Amino acid sequence: MLKLAVIGKDVSKSDSGRMHTFILRGLGRDCSYELMSSSAEDFDTNAKKLLAEYDAFNVTIPYKLDIIPYLERTEGDAVTFGAVNTVKGGIGYNTDGAGFSLMLKNNGIDPAGRKVLVLGA
């Protein structure tokens, strides 16, 4: 069984657990997905627990920068953006840009030659 989680300041209303569980179970994978709200004071303990005990986890505000020193390395867009929203095997990734690009493509929007402002990623 995959052990997954999301960590953020207050993730009590997050849909991440339902979304990831639905998708993974649809693919025939058994998983659990924990919502881990963390204060700044508890972040060190929680980050270490996630890295030691979970297969992968998501990171949301305000910890997308704070998680980086705990990681072995960052790859891809996480290097470019300097922020991490997904961790697997001690490696940090950022899927925000790819997700945004996919949304544009799926809605027939071509940003080529246009100015784009992204807020809240």
State each model region's role.
Residues K9, G120-A121:
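Glycine-rich Rossmann-fold phosphate-binding loop(s) that bind the pyrophosphate
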Residues L2-I109:
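Phosphate/diphosphate ligand-binding glycine-rich loop within oxidoreductases
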